[in-house]
Structure formats: C-alpha cells, structure tokens
A protein has these predicted regions:
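Glycine/threonine-rich phosphate-binding loop and adjacent beta-strand/alpha-helix elements that clamp
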Residues: 526-552, 567-569, 648
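Active-site phosphate/pyrophosphate-binding segments
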Residues: 326-445
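A glycine-rich phosphate-binding loop feature that marks nucleotide/adenosyl-phosphate handling sites
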Residues: 163-164, 310-313, 367, 410-421, ...
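N-terminal export/assembly segments and adjacent metallocofactor-ligating motifs
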Residues: 2-302, 328, 461, 469, ...
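Extended redox/cofactor-interaction regions of prokaryotic respiratory oxidoreductases
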Residues: 2-3, 176-263, 270, 288, ...
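Phosphate/diphosphate-binding loops
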Residues: 500-501, 548-564
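Long, contiguous, secondary-structure-rich segments that constitute the structural scaffold
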Residues: 559-611, 703-705, 709-720, 724-811
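Long, well-ordered, tryptophan-enriched scaffold segments
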Residues: 266-370
Length: 811
C-alpha cells in the first residue's frame, strides 16, 4: 500500500487525511471546528463583552487524557468553551487541546435531562419511575438501609460498583477502590473488594506473569524506532485529543520515519492515512499470528539468543525452570515438539487468522530485521475470552528479538505515560479482605455464597459468605449499559429480594440510574474545585486546577458533601474519620502541600489556581520500560519469582493444575494460542456466523457524552459490515438492520465498508440502551452489551466483551 504521489500530486496519505477531516467537519454541522474557531471566538468575545469571566476546568472522563478547558461564563452560565492556549505549542510542550467531546461540555452542563433533585423509586427497577424527595429523607433512608444491611449480613454484603465516569478526579474520583465512597465505607467497617477493570482485566492480569508489571515505552520514544507494529491499538479514536497520544505518535514518526504496520480486524482512524500497511486479522487470533511469526524467527535464526539466555526463563530447555515438563518450553511449543505436536508454521497460523501465509513470513522478517522495533498492543485484543494468552503472546515478539528495555523498542504492552504524581484523597485500609473480579458482581448478587476461589476467582477466602445486598454506584453506568448481557442483568436486578438497595449518584438519568432505589444528583467536575493530573499523555505531564464555573443549580450537591452527610448519620466517629474536620477545599490544600513537600518544583497552590494548567516534560526524555533491568538484571531484577522475564510461568502452571475450568477454557504457563467460546471456529457460527467486537467511538467516552445531540449527529451509531457479508444478506449502506444472537437484539443502520474484515462485524461501544423491558426488549439505542455475555475469562475472570457471535438481517 504505497504512499507515493498520485499523477495529480496528492499522496494517498494526504488524501485520506484531508477527506477524513472534511467528512467530520460536514457531519458535525453545528460544532465549531478549527476552520471557524477564531472567528467564532471573536464573535463570542464581542457579544459577551467585559462581563464574561474565564474559568479553568477539565474533561475528566475515562478516555484518560484529561484535557484542559477554558470555560467562558456570563450570568452564572457557561456560554462558550475553548481549550488550552498556553505555551509555545511545540512538540514536548504542546497545548493540551480538548477534542470535540470536551469542547461540547456546555451541552452536558446545560442538558435538559440533568438530575436536579434527590429522588426515590416508585416503579419497578428499570422503569425509570421516581418521585422527588428532600435531601434529609434521601440521606436518612440511605443511612438506615446501609445500617440494616451491615447489621443483618455484615460488611461483605456491601459493594461499590465499578465506575469510571470521573476517573480523572481527586476528591471527585469515581474509581471504586480510590473513591470517596470507598473512604466512607472503610470508615464504617469496609465493603467487598474488587480487582481488575473493564478496560484492562486480561492484560493487567497476564503481563505481570511475564514481566512482573505491565509497563511499556512512552509513545514519544517512537522517534528512536525503525519499525512500529500495533496490535489493535487505536489512539486516534481512544486517545484522540491533544491530551492524548495521537499527537506524539505522529510527531515521533515524523522524526524517525519509522514504518508503521497496523494489525486489526478494522481499518481504524489510526491506520487511515498514517499507516504503511494494514493487516486485517480475525478477532481473538493474535496469539496464532505471533506463533507463526515466531516459527519464522526461530527457523531463520532471527531471534536474539544472547538476550533470551541472559534475561529470560523458559525459552528453551536450558532456561526451563525446575518442575516444568521436558519440552515444556516455548521453542518446543512453536516447533511442534511440545504436548500438542503441532508445528506453528505460517501456514498453520494463516488458516486461523485469515492472513495470507506469505504476509506472515514477510512480517516476521520485518520484525526480525528491524531494530529497534516498537511492538505494542491496545486493550481491544485482550478484551477477548482468551485475552490473557493474547497479551502474553504479543509480548513474545519484542522478547524474541531483544527489543525490551531499549530506546525505540517496547515490551509489547500498551504505551506508558509520564505523569506528575499527585497526592490522592486517602481511602484508608479496607477491613474486609475478600475480593471478587469487578466483572462478576452480578454473579455475587445472584449466587454469592456459591462463588469460590478456584472456580470464580474469589480472593481472600475460599468462598463468599453472603451475596451482595447493598450496591453503591457513583459516576458510572456499569449497572446496565457498560456491563454484559443487559437482559440477564435486568432479570437479576428486578428481584429485590437479592440486592436489596441500589444507590446511584450521577448527573443524568442513565440506563443504570433507572435501576436505582435512591437517585442522588451530583455536581459535574467543572462545577466544583479539584486538582487532576494527566494520564495517557506521552512524555509531558501536567496538572489542571479545576474551579467551579457556575454555582450549584437546583438541589445538586458535590459528592464530598453527600458522603459527609451520610457519615454524620452513621455516627460521630465515622464522620470525624471521614472528614478529619476538613472541607473539600481544605482537603485540596492539605494534599497539595504534601505534593509540594515531595516535589518542590511544583508551583504554589495559589499560583497553580491562577495558572489553571502546569506542564512538565519527562526529565528522562522518554520512558523506557525495564531499562534498568536490561542494563543490570542482577541489581534491578523484575518483580517475577525468578527476577527475569518469565516466558514459562510456574505460577500459571500451578493455577492451571488447581483451578476448576470448563472444557473450552485454557490457562497455560506458556503464551500459547487457544480457541475459545464464541470464537471464529465455534460450531455456534452455523447459527450466528459473524464475529462481533466493539470499539471506542469518537462521539463518546464509553457512555459519557452519549446523550449530547451534536455528537450523536456527527457520529451515528452504526454496525460495520463487509460488502461481501452485506451482499449475501441484501444489505446496503445505511439500511436499518437487526443485529442479534441468543442474548438479545439491537437495531441500527448498517455501515457497509471494506474497512472491516469479511466474517467480522463491529459496533461503537457505549451507546445508551433503549428498550421496552416489559415488551420485546429490542434495543433501539443499539448498546452492544445487549449482545455480550456474562461468562468471564478463565484467568482474570474479566469481561470478554469482544468475543461474540451474531447474525445481521435487514429490517
């Protein structure tokens, strides 16, 4: 796929860039895009005059980038939003420019569906029928129900559901184990713990078995690379803002001229106009591709044998750990000398992945002959049922070629980021030591005491003693919208004898809020004071001081006030432990003083407040994962049992022998390929022939911003389908279709495009569920989780939400 100039003098890359941007501009319609930005800004300034003030805020939703916003406020209303305009805007010290989501935040602040008053449910869960109540009644009821559950069942029956709507906050942070809700519960005897995330369950679990952690080189280090290979990594949509890494990817490649290969079932926006080659692959088969590449590397003597001998365990017989079976090493597995007796040739890999044999061989030689090579993976490939094997397998490519711990190389993980470490609101120690995977909370409601350590991944004890009876849900949509199998989840939550109380604290009547027993209106982050750091932002760290843009409207309250009032009702000792006598602003001042004590280069509190944003480049230039280990493995061992890279993991071998697994589940000490349920070769494909996976969509961050009209208009919810599959079904581009399987049905327009592999379909995840749950349950909002499964992955017990089989028909 050449980037040479066409006869008219326009390169393919330039053409794709210009048409993609132009299409978005036309689709966006009412959005202010860069073409008219200065003119619009001047018009606003002229119209508002001297009565307008500018307040620094931030978008702190879970794309992770956390971009600065400059909110123009007049008469206590946000009338205009712009973004960071500080500094010289040069590479390494650039302006943190928000994407269209952050720039549309005014429409979220003033949305007609904002929650304004505390309410209690009067209909059935999910019907969305509520009546307004006073804050006193709401807080008294909440405290009484919490006391009752703890008295009857114990603190293990209380659970803080996974949520990431304000993942960037500090005082306002929603991440369950680090939220103010967790602090409150830890002051009141604790609550059932959770581990893992919906974003990274498999990779965060798997990579530490190889490296002891999950680090990768920063994207900026690509300026030292000769080759970039991206497995399912799509920063142009997942990290698309100026606070994200797309800018770094482009700028670093401008400096290195590194060739970039994108391996993905979908021709993503990261690929379009940027890549040198797109290699489409069947979902869930990346580990087979890696094995086919490894066969070529080994047989053509392209592996870095000295690196493997010095730094690794389990590559061949001489580095195999004690207790491992003969020929239990990785080299034997690849050459067909292991238990299965199958050589992982490129021909073998081609049948599984759908990639031509010749292309696998060519890719292997490119990787083996290009050093340094930046080989990375996004979080999509690991969000499969066999994702933990995929994550470890992709890491084998930099391991085999000795690209770990060097500039321009990588570990095979997703990119790491330089951040300015902030002092978080302390959540205190949780007295309850039992934990479940964050994905299995519906199981813990439905069959809690049946859940065990060896079958369900319960940690801290052999089994749960009680089911979940009280559910907190703060700034999250994972009760329904972002959790799997919505119809099954609905049935579980409908039974009020199971989970007795659900408390939702949010800004909108989300799909999850409809299931609340008590529904409390929270302030947005731009309506209260907080200090947040960057994340996923290359090698420039920054802090943003958020100040309230407007006063609190109606009866909306900040989360710290809500929980402080609950703490009062739980006892004076609980209130004192929770607040320590501080207001929200006093907590910020206290925590920031601790930061400055550790990092004197930071500006003073009042200076940061005045500046709005503070930036600092990584003093080491680029983050290089495991650099110290590479330089001196004896002085800087990894956090693995051997202190080395563990290609063969004795810990995984022990787990595989002890845990209870289904016949189609695999836990292996080696990074092997394994088929899985609802994979490309599942017999169920005779009924549901299309694989379906989700992707992060530009119009939303998960479900955040999913109710903003202009973003919905700019980026319609569609199902991607290849022209070959569409033709078989009589489907044309734009046709309304039904996507369905044994779990549910959604309806939405079809996007017929060669940008998706045949036999595969894809939908943007996070669309708001919209179905008549007392009727046909057809989801006209087209939330992908109407179609996904509750069945967790074997090792991490995490969400396999990209492993699905469906069919598509024209309506």
């Amino acid at each position: 796929m050449s980037n040479q100039e066409s006869p008219g003098g326009v390169s393919r890359r330039a053409l794709l860039k210009s048409t993609a941007l132009g299409s978005l501009a036309l689709a966006a319609g009412g959005l202010t895009l860069p073409f008219t930005l200065r003119r619009a800004a001047a018009a606003v300034q002229q119209a508002t005059g001297d009565t307008t003030r500018i307040v620094w805020g931030a978008c702190s939703v879970n794309c992770g980038s956390r971009c600065a916003l400059r909110l123009h406020v007049r008469d206590d209303e946000v009338v205009y939003v712009e973004t960071d305009n500080t500094g010289d805007d040069r590479y390494g010290d650039h302006q943190v420019r928000a994407c269209l989501r952050g720039r549309s935040i005014r429409r979220r602040i003033n949305h007609p569906d904002r929650l304004n008053y505390p309410m209690k449910r009067v209909g059935k869960r999910g019907e969305g029928k509520f009546v307004r109540i006073s804050w006193q009644e709401a807080l008294d009821t909440l405290a009484d129900r919490l006391k009752s559950v703890v008295a009857q069942y114990g603190n293990e029956a209380v659970y803080i559901n996974y949520s990431s709507g304000i993942v960037g906050g500090n005082i306002t942070r929603s991440s369950p184990s680090a939220s103010p809700v967790a602090r409150l519960m830890n002051c009141y005897g604790g609550s059932l713990n959770q581990y893992g995330t919906y974003s990274t369950a498999q990779i965060a679990c798997a990579m530490p078995y190889t490296y002891g952690s999950n680090d990768g080189n920063s994207t900026s280090d690509i300026e030292n690379s000769k080759l970039v290979v991206m497995f399912g990594n799509n920063p142009a949509e997942t990290r698309m803002s100026g606070g994200g890494i797309t800018w770094y990817l482009e700028q670093a490649r401008e400096r290195s001229n590194a060739r970039m290969i994108v391996i993905d079932p979908r021709y993503t926006d990261t690929a379009a106009g940027r890549e040198d080659e797109w290699i489409p692959i069947r979902p869930g088969t990346d580990a087979a591709l890696v094995a086919g590449i490894a066969w070529v590397l080994i047989n053509e003597d392209l592996v870095d044998q000295p690196f493997l001998d010095k730094y690794c365990v389990g590559y061949d017989e001489k580095t195999l750990p004690a207790g491992a079976p003969a020929n239990g090493h990785y080299k034997a597995y690849i050459l067909g000398e292991g238990d299965d007796g199958i050589a992982k040739t490129p021909q073998w890999a081609s049948r599984i992945t759908g990639i031509p044999t010749e292309r696998i061989i060519k890719l292997a030689r490119e990787i083996g002959m290009s050093k340094p090579a930046y080989i990375c993976q996004g979080w999509g490939p690991q969000r499969q049922a066999n994702g933990k094997l995929t994550a470890r397998a992709i890491a084998m490519l930099p391991i085999l070629t000795g690209n770990v711990g060097i500039n321009g190389g990588n570990s095979g993980a997703r990119e790491s980021t330089y951040t300015i470490t902030i002092e978080r609101l302390p959540v205190l120690e949780n007295p309850v030591k039992t934990a479940i995977s964050c994905f299995t909370w519906t199981d813990a409601i439905a069959r809690g005491p049946e859940m065990t350590a060896s079958r369900d991944g319960v940690r801290g004890k052999e089994k749960l003693d009680v089911p979940i009876k009280f559910l907190w849900n703060y700034a999250g949509n994972t009760i329904i919208n972002q959790h799997s199998d919505i119809n099954k989840t609905h049935e579980i939550l409908q039974d009020e004898s199971k989970c007795e109380t659900i408390v939702v604290i949010d800004n909108f009547m989300t799909s999850s809020a409809k299931y609340a027993d008590l529904l409390l209106p929270d302030l947005m982050t731009v309506e209260q004071e907080d200090i947040i750091p960057n994340d996923y932002a290359g090698n420039m760290g920054y802090l943003i001081f958020i100040q309230p843009a407007t006063s609190a409207k109606f009866e909306r309250k900040p989360i710290y006030w809500i929980l402080s009032e609950v703490a009062k009702r739980l006892g004076d000792d609980v209130h004192q432990r929770f607040t320590e006598g501080r207001t929200q602003e006093q907590w910020l001042q206290y925590l920031y003083a601790k930061m400055v004590a550790k990092d004197p280069a930071l500006p003073a509190y009042e200076d940061l407040k005045r500046m709005g944003i503070y930036k600092r480049k990584d003093p080491n230039g680029h983050f290089v994962a495991y650099r110290d280990f590479r330089r001196d493995p004896e002085a800087h061992p990894l956090k693995t049992p051997s202190g080395k890279i563990e290609i063969y993991s004795s810990r995984l071998a022990e787990i595989a022998a002890r845990w209870q697994l289904e016949k189609d589940e695999v836990i292996s000490p080696l990074p092997v390929y394994a088929s899985t349920f609802e994979g490309w070769d599942d017999p169920l494909r005779s009924q549901y022939p299309l694989q379906l996976f989700g992707f992060h969509y530009k119009a939303r961050t998960h479900s955040s911003y999913g109710n903003v009209d202009v973003l919905q208009a700019a980026c319609r919810q569609e199902v991607w389908i290849n022209p070959l599959d569409a033709e078989k079904r009589g489907i044309k581009n734009g046709d309304m279709v039904r996507v369905f399987n044994q779990r549910g049905e959604v309806r939405l327009p079809a996007k017929v495009t060669p940008r998706i592999m045949p036999g595969v379909s894809a939908m943007g995840q996070g669309a708001w569920h919209d179905a008549n749950m007392t009727g046909d349950r057809i989801d006209h909002g087209a939330c992908m989780n109407t179609l996904t499964t509750h069945r967790p992955s074997p090792l991490a017990k995490g969400n396999p939400q990209h492993t699905n089989l469906v069919d598509i028909e024209k309506v």
